[in-house]
Amino acid sequence: MAAVAQSLQEQVAWACRILAAEGYADLTLGHVSARAADGSIWIKRKGVALAEVEADDVVSVEDTDAVLHLETVLHTGVYAVRADVGAVVHGHPPYATALGATTADLVPLTHDGILFADGVARFDDPDLIVNDDKGGAVAVALGERRALLMENHGVLVVGNDIPWAVLTAVTLERAARLQSIAHAFGELQPIDAQVAKELQPVKYRDEFVSEYWEAWQRQLDRAGGGLGGDRA
């Protein structure tokens, strides 16, 4: 299938639907945002489930008529300090959220885990992030990393664009799930840290991410969950 040019709002809508299919569905909770070339920030509106987001459900954070999520400051806080970030995901996937409720670290057990060879950040306040001060504190905790476990709450994931943010979010949950499964079998045997860092740029390339992004959309279309369908 040839790639089709998509608006930023369409990309955010696709991201929401893909994440819903990949373990991030949680009623109307969870949100994805993206930063446009002009610096404007667009985010899934409040009140709609990830699996049913359409392009017109993606609104500007500056729109005074839009109903925004309470935790929109999670997104604006990161964009304020990370010029490299073009997209942000917040959600409550079960395995990564459960990992964040323990003292265990995510380790590079598989090729999924090597995406986080530089570590996953942590934020130790379980409260909702509803003001600029807390949004800024989360951004500080994230630092230069690509993912953060919000202890007893959920996850925050960033990418330089929407496909990368989605891949990172999906891979974080998969890595946490595989670690949980492996732990049930016995002692964990992670990939050597240096090997993981060397393998990461081989395994995770822009061209691969583009392939995965298009594949996710084809899968959703075949399942009837693509854009333009009926509300879930």
Question: What is each of the regions a protein language model found here?
Answer:
Residues 1-232:
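Glycine-rich flexible loops
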